[in-house]
Amino acid sequence: MNGDDAFARRPRAGAQIPEKIQKSFDDIAKYFSKKEWEKMKSLEKISYVYMKRKYEAMTKLGFKATLPPFMHNTGATDLQGNDFDNDRNQGNQVERPQMTFCRLQRIFPKIMPKKPAEEGNDSKGVPEASGSQNDGKHLCPPGKPSTSEKINKTSGPKRGKHAWTHRLRERKQLVIYEEISDPEEDDE
């Protein structure tokens, strides 16, 4: 038996259960009747403890996690004290802290944009082709730049559809690529 699974080991008769384990078991025991709790093996109890911990972690991160099935049994309340079965009772509810944009940006820095897009500048500057109407061609009036010129000139969230183009850099020197042949093809 590994030393890491101390949580999973059964205490000997007369031995005391550590406070941390006892507290987590007590948190889970309130969802079961005394008979059910006594019939459960310690491994089952531990799995319920882990289920609850995962649920707590997901809700703390701001995700809408489904309530574990064993927590439905007694008209359970969620971690913030909100009563699932009785939404009429607004006085007893604790306001849940909302996930702010800055927190999300710290958690998912590459996914979230650095600045929220301005409402007036979404993608109005770049027209899109719609089916066979324009056949993929855009007609620009003579003094206005084409869409490809607009993409090169604009920066930030104003780009709309081509938001990734700012990551590409222009090469200062012309690069010539050679085709490398496979040694297997040379044999034939």
Swiss-Prot record:
| A single GO cellular-component term on record | nucleus
Q: Where is the composition biased (Basic residues)?
A: 156-170
InterPro entries of this UniProt entry? aKRAB (IPR003655), KRAB (IPR001909), KRAB_dom_sf (IPR036051), SSXRD_motif (IPR019041)
Region described as Disordered: spans on this chain: 77-188
Q: In this chain, where does the modification Phosphoserine occur?
A: 123
Q: Domain named KRAB-related: which ranges?
A: 20-83
Please tell me in which tissues this protein is expressed.
Testis-specific. Expressed in a melanoma cell line.
Return the Acidic residues bias intervals. Answer: 179-188
Show the PANTHER family listed in the entry.
PROTEIN SSX7-RELATED, SYNOVIAL SARCOMA, X MEMBER
Stated role = Could act as a modulator of transcription.
Q: Which UniProt keywords apply?
A: Phosphoprotein, Transcription, Transcription regulation
Note the Pfam families from the entry.
SSXRD
Protein family membership: Belongs to the SSX family.
Taxonomically, what lineage is the organism? Eukaryota, Metazoa, Chordata, Craniata, Vertebrata
Supply the name of the protein.
Protein SSX7
Compositionally biased residues, Polar residues = 145-155
Could you name the domain of life of the organism this protein comes from? Answer: Eukaryota
Q: Which GO terms describe its biological process?
A: regulation of DNA-templated transcription
